[in-house]
Amino acid sequence: MALNDFHVSEPYTLGIELEMQVINPPGYDLSQDSSTLIDAVKPQLTAGEIKHDITESMLEMATGVCRDIDQAAAQLSAMQHVILQAASEHHLGICGGGTHPFQKWQRQEVCDNERYQRTLENFGYLIQQATVFGQHVHVGCANGDDAIYLLHGLSHFVPHFIALSAASPYMQGADTRFACARLNIFSAFPDNGPMPWVSNWQEFTGLFRRLSYTTMIDSIKDLHWDIRPSPAFGTVEVRVMDTPLTLDHAINMAGLIQATAHWLLTERPFKPQEQDYLLYKFNRFQACRYGLESVLIDVYTGDRRRLADDTLRLLDNVTLSARKLGADSAIDALRLQVKKGGNEAQYMREFIADGGSLIGLVQKHCEIWAGQ
């Protein structure tokens, strides 16, 4: 299948997608009623989009094209209000978090959607297991070559994005010992992890053509890379974050990615090389396992750095870009998070250590999302 031409978009514009959990109180397991909720909400939207994701326990909120994080926050907040009102009327709950802590994948119903049914045919039970919840951030690019450079530049900071957003320590009723267990779900997919190496947009079109030979790839949406170009939107899409427990944290993560993109494309601090990726999966694994306490290994020198320290260095590097984009509040909030040494996975474990149950944890997450 031919690839769309890269749509020219205004650089550094934003789009945010949040995959939300639809919850069935009082047991607080995942519901299978997202279609009912989506049908109730759609007529009330004034901006953005609410749609299905893989299974009937998932709901995706997506902004339109936003110039800055304030506009994105306004759109998401309006959607949040409408969704919560409809959820209350249908006796459902809504929450964030990268995984539901005790749902059973065998119970998950794949949406009655041509694309998802085709994906179920291709991947079998792996699609039901992929009932996990992430945040995706799109950043606008002027052309395809800029998009490829930006993708490679952002790949340096995949561990940082994972650790800051980690919110999936529990799965199938057990503590996984990971800060972010969600990304492990995709390890069996043939396109998991980083995009295969290309150096420019022309090479990318050739890569996509070859991937389409598999008959499993009909569009860019069928590729599960950590970061991927989206030519129809004219963006680069970062896909490694867990869905946060709060809208504020989702906005902060989007602000960081927007500011990092601006810094990368204006300063060009890296000359991308295929060798950059030799330790990519090791560093990614470390971030998933240990969060901000993990250790990064420099592929060229062998130097070892605490991810928390390297994250503070990234925040310092992008501060000026954030100020120009109106995203400095996001950088300030994330800097404070790193200095306090925590993420939402750590909070979840503390809740359980203090005597809470997994059912109580999901109930608490619904209350947090509802602002209670």
Swiss-Prot record:
InterPro entries: GCL_type2/YbdK_subfam, GCS2, Gln_synth/guanido_kin_cat_dom, YbdK
Top-level taxon of origin: Bacteria
SUPFAM superfamilies associated with the record: Glutamine synthetase/guanido kinase (SSF55931)
Major enzyme class: ligase
GO biological process: modified amino acid biosynthetic process
The UniProt record lists the keyword ATP-binding: yes
Name of the featured protein: Putative glutamate--cysteine ligase 2
Gene: ybdK
